[in-house]
Design a protein with these regions (language model features):
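Extended, low-aromatic, Leu/Ala- and acidic/polar-enriched alpha-helical coiled-coil segments
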Residues: 155-163
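Long amphipathic alpha-helical coiled-coil segments
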Residues: 176-190
Length: 204
C-alpha cells in the first residue's frame, strides 16, 4: 500500500472519483462547485494537481484521450478505495472550524462605531439568508433522489447554520440600533437576552 501522505484534498479527489467514476480535473472542480464547495471550498489549483500525485502513488489510474483535447481521466483503484475506506472509518477528533470575516470584523468593532456595526450586521444577515436560499434550492432540486440522502445531510447542516447565523446578526443589528455606544453595559445583555428568548421559544 502507498505510504503517500494524504490530506483533505486527497480524500476529496478519491471520494469524488469513487462516487462518479472516471473524472477529469475539470469534472472534479465542477463537482466541488456544485456540492462540497458550499461548506468547504478548495483551491482549483489543488484539484488540478492532486489527481496526478495520487496516480503516481497508485491510488488513481490515469487514462488519456487518444484524440481531441487529450484530456486526462482518473479512476480510483482498489488501493485508493482501501485508503479512502480507512479514512472514512477514522474518528473525527478535530473541532469544527469557523472562519468568518464578518465575525472577525465584529470582534474589532469597538474600534468603529454603532453605525458601522449596524451596517455589518445587516450585510451579514442578508448574506446568510442568500446562502440559505441556495441550500433550499439544492434540497428542492434533489428531493426526489433518495440515493443522495447522506450527501444532502451536509446541506441540511448548512441550512441550520445559515439560519442560526442570520438570526444572530439580526440580534446584533437590533442591539446595536438600540445602543448609543459599543461600551454600553446593555450591549451584551441585550443580545444574550435575545438568545435566551430564542432558546425558550425553541423548547416550547
Amino acid at each position: 500500500m502507498s505510504s503517500l501522505r494524504l490530506g483533505p484534498v486527497s480524500y476529496l479527489v478519491l471520494g469524488i472519483t469513487a462516487l462518479r467514476g472516471p473524472s477529469t480535473p475539470y469534472d472534479l472542480k465542477r463537482f466541488v462547485q456544485l456540492s462540497i464547495g458550499h461548506f468547504w471550498p478548495f483551491p482549483h489549483t489543488q484539484l488540478y494537481a492532486e489527481p496526478e500525485r495520487l496516480a503516481e502513488a497508485g491510488l488513481l489510474e490515469e487514462t488519456r484521450e487518444e484524440g481531441g483535447r487529450r484530456r486526462r481521466h482518473y479512476t480510483i483503484t482498489d488501493a485508493g478505495r482501501e485508503r479512502l475506506g480507512e479514512w472514512l472509518e477514522e474518528p473525527v477528533t478535530s473541532p469544527t472550524e469557523i472562519r468568518d470575516l464578518g465575525v472577525l470584523k465584529l470582534f474589532f468593532s469597538e474600534l468603529t462605531g454603532i453605525d458601522e456595526i449596524v451596517a455589518l450586521a445587516h450585510e451579514q444577515a442578508a448574506a446568510h439568508r442568500a446562502k440559505l436560499a441556495v441550500y433550499d434550492g439544492l434540497m428542492e432540486r434533489f428531493a426526489d433522489r433518495p440515493e443522495l440522502a447522506t450527501r444532502l445531510l451536509s446541506v441540511e447542516l448548512g441550512m441550520r447554520l445559515a439560519h442560526a447565523a442570520a438570526g444572530f446578526w439580526d440580534d446584533v443589528q437590533s442591539a446595536a440600533s438600540a445602543s448609543e455606544s459599543t461600551a454600553s453595559g446593555d450591549w451584551l445583555a441585550s443580545i444574550t437576552a435575545m438568545r435566551s428568548g430564542s432558546e425558550a421559544a425553541s423548547a416550547s
